[in-house]
From Swiss-Prot:
Protein name: Shikimate dehydrogenase (NADP(+))
Catalytic reaction annotation: shikimate + NADP(+) = 3-dehydroshikimate + NADPH + H(+)
Keywords, sorted A to Z: Amino-acid biosynthesis, Aromatic amino acid biosynthesis, NADP, Oxidoreductase
Residues given in the record as shikimate binding sites: S19, L20, S21, T66, N91, D107, Y230
Subunit annotation: Homodimer.
UniProt-annotated binding residues for NADP(+): G129, S130, G131, G132, A133, L228, G251
Pathway participation: Metabolic intermediate biosynthesis; chorismate biosynthesis; chorismate from D-erythrose 4-phosphate and phosphoenolpyruvate: step 4/7
Organism this protein belongs to: Prochlorococcus marinus (strain MIT 9515)
Amino acid sequence: MITSNTSFLALIGNPVSHSLSPIMQNAAIKYLGLDLIYIAIPCKNEDLEIVVNSLKKMNCKGLNITIPFKKKVFDLCSEISPVAKKIQAINTLKLKNDNNWSGTNTDIEGFIYPLKNLNLTNKNSIILGSGGAARSVIQGLIDLKLSKITIISRNNNSLNELITLFKNDIKIEGILNTNDEIGNLIEETDLIVNTTPIGMSQTSDNDAIPFGQSSWETIDSNTIVYDLIYNPSPTPFLKFCDRKGCMTIDGTQMLIAQGAKSLSFWTNGLEVPFEVMHDALKKYL
């Protein structure tokens, strides 16, 4: 029951109407018997500082931060975790006792979650896309001790940024999606991760495959293919790779695992029920 004493957690971004976070977070909150509620708050670019600082004065305990604010909230935090500093992205804020925000990033642990029991040490990986999501993926693959990462992208500037950021941590290279060597790379890689929005329900490319179907005809059936998109599930890309005999992973487990880690962060280490969150999403979708 919501009362005047009920605290709240919120997702801040633009847009947030498509987010499934309130569904899974409120299911976990109810299961744990917490006097909390989780809501999504749309925020314009120019209003970010006002909104985030105003929430300090309300009964807000923590925030999730999504596109396009994961870097912009740095200046609003008095404390930032080393991992968030490293990848230059914050997705979770917690209000400290001194009424200032502490920022961290749970996307990396979320990304790793479905890969933890696979032996990827010294394996090679291809990452599709060089946007913000690629940073968490690269750090996750470093943590899993892969030996080499190749990023395929349409944007040379963002490719170079990522290589500069991570070149001291792992063997990493970037190539443009027009490179003739892509077919050979795909044939030889162990893990492919799609971080692009191609295939997402809300995009005009919702029936498309990253860089075109012809790029993937040579994919080996032993390759693991991981698409960060969770709606639709599976994506056209995963359907294609599944028909090729590949092991496929969608973005649902990452979504839940990063959300569970955020809720644990807000509640000082409380064990959060993954399955309860998963069942809530499954029922909704």
